[in-house]
A protein has these predicted regions:
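Immediate flanking context of iron-sulfur cluster ligation sites
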Residues: 75-87
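Short, glycine-anchored, charge-dense loop/turn motifs used at functional sites
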Residues: 43-49
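Short beta-strand scaffold segments in enzyme catalytic cores
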Residues: 36-42
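A short, polar/charged loop-to-alpha-helix boundary motif
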Residues: 56-68
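Zinc-dependent deaminase
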Residues: 1-28, 100-169
Length: 169
């Protein structure tokens, strides 16, 4: 497998892509799902190849997107792609991205920040295992960009009243 370097992303590109992922999350919420959104971005850093909102507790946006990508694109191409997601990938999603051979992830808010919003909500028992730790246990140099302060408030706004009454102090 190839581990060719990625085309750099500008901060403006990162912010634009995260805002688009947040629109996917907004649509997921409008459908009654949890407000998470993910994009698969082509090696050019601009072209969005796929969008995915959260499906359910087991089919997170990032995992569904990574599995679909692995079925439709060759691994060396996926290594050059970027998975953009509103919240830091959980251990399941990071693992799925790793096995799909998607070489970079960009996320808006940390899993720890998400946990402060979800608290002990039964529908989202959020873990506290940073994706950098998951990737560090593997053999592939997955690039991680995040959190991104410029979009944190926008992403948090979709979650704030979703999990009300279940916050950690």
């Amino acid at each position: 497998m190839s581990f060719a370097p990625h085309t750099p992303l500008s901060q403006d590109q990162i912010i634009t892509l995260l805002r688009r992922a947040n629109e996917v999350a907004r649509r997921a919420r409008a459908l009654g799902r949890h407000p998470f959104g993910a994009l698969l971005v082509a090696p050019d850093g601009h072209t969005v190849l796929a969008e995915q909102g959260n499906v359910d507790t087991v089919n997170h946006a990032e995992s569904v997107l990574a599995r679909t990508a692995a079925l439709n694109y060759p691994p060396d191409y996926l290594w050059q792609c970027t998975l953009v997601t509103t919240a830091e990938p959980c251990a399941m999603c990071a693992g799925t991205q790793y096995w799909a051979h998607i070489g970079r992830v960009v996320y808006g808010i940390t899993e720890e920040r998400l946990l402060s919003l979800t608290g002990d909500h039964a529908e989202n028992p959020t873990m506290n295992l940073p994706c950098r730790e998951v990737f560090a246990r593997g053999q592939k140099p997955v690039e991680v960009i995040g959190p991104v302060a410029e979009v944190e408030d926008e992403i948090v706004a979709l979650h704030r009243d979703m999990w009300s009454g279940h916050h950690h102090a």
